[in-house]
Amino acid sequence: MSKPVVAIVGRPNVGKSTLFNRLAGGLVAIVENRPGVTRDRLYRDSEWLGRKFTIIDTGGIEFVNENTPITAQMRRQAEIAIEEADVIVFVIDAQISPTPDDDMIAQTLRRSGKPVILAANKVENFAKTELYEFYNLGLGEPVPISAVHGMNIGDLLDEVVSHFPEDIEEEVDPDTIRIAVVGRPNVGKSSLVNTLLGEERVIVSNIPGTTRDAIDSAFEHEGKHYIIIDTAGMRRKGRIEELTEQYSVSRSLRAVDRSDVILMLLDAGEGVTEQDKKIAGYAHEAGKGIVLVVNKWDLIEKDDKTMNRFEKDIREELGFMQYAPTLFISAKTGQRVTKLLDLVDFVAEQNSTRVATATLNTLVREWVHLNPPPTDKGRRLKVLYATQVGVKPPTFVFFVNDHELMHFSYRRYLENQLRSSFGFEGSPIRMIVRQKDEERE
């Protein structure tokens, strides 16, 4: 299920990033009292009343002073966010009258046809603030807020959530594996999807996806069922067409949310880019199974060491994803493409692996005996017991005498031991450390 998207827009210096940080639960966007600090779109997940959603912070939109390249770029970024959004929060400064930029932005938002909530920010005295001037923007009743102090944010979120589309449950066989093919533009996503589908004799159907403008292709292979979520097949609209690279990140994130296994495509000729890192990081945090697929391998001049060098470079650039298997392919020629589905099956199984509690604790005792935790000011960490509490991704709780004694290096040691004993190849592992009450030890 794809999460709704909420875009925060407005002219510069009205408090968009402060509101974004308030909703994201921490300091994510840089907040300074000058225009133009947020130039690119920032994405974070949030939740209200049990509804999860993605929020986007954008740079300020200016129409009056739009002659600089940076101003034009920031405006384009905001236009992309509007295109992506299910709900738009238009932030205005309640301490001054509407400006010409406010009027122009309001016109743009009305034409979008999206639900728009007018958030009147910087309200310090709710009893005395007059907001009647802002009704002229034609966007309904303003919601007075103070993003800095967190005042009335709950009312704003109530209004936001009320506009979310209803959840639509997809009727899909639980044994069906959903595969998201993600990556930058021109990396070969469409070619890979077409090659995979073209090699299969039984293409069951095309299923309209819950993600806007996506077409999911369902097919069978050796009696197993798959759905490919094809981000490359999405339509691009109007002025957004020229901004395919920026827009592709959002499409990829939505596909990640709905998938079981991700095929992360990299261009053999370009290596790992910053955008690749962003998409890979989102996949890692989402707990999805992942395969790193290096495409266009047929175009690379190589010797017997080229593949090893390339894989080493990938591991250095994506250090947080050492667990992901790598496959070098050519979607154009079909080189090694037939191996992909076997690897997808394997990674999906690894991401769903369960470990019996008795087996786990026997091994945990051995690991601690072989490598006892270091002492900290005379105190030593005691790992009392562990249990697995979830899959997709495999999630483990370690009960200890004092969670503050669990150093990140020892946590990494335990994760490495889990992988050595049980595999989990292609799958992230979640580790939760909880402190056991002294009297219950």
Curated annotation (Swiss-Prot):
* Binding-site residues for GTP 2, renumbered to this chain: 183-190, 230-234, 295-298
In alphabetical order, the GO MF annotations are:
ATP hydrolysis activity; GTP binding; ribosome binding
Name the UniProt record assigns to this protein: GTPase Der
- Gene encoding this chain? der
- Which organism was this protein described from? Desulfitobacterium hafniense (strain Y51)
Boundaries of every EngA-type G domain copy? 4-168, 177-352
Against SMART domains, the record matches this protein to:
AAA
Cited function? GTPase that plays an essential role in the late steps of ribosome biogenesis.
**What quaternary structure, including any partners, is listed in this protein's UniProt entry?**
Associates with the 50S ribosomal subunit.
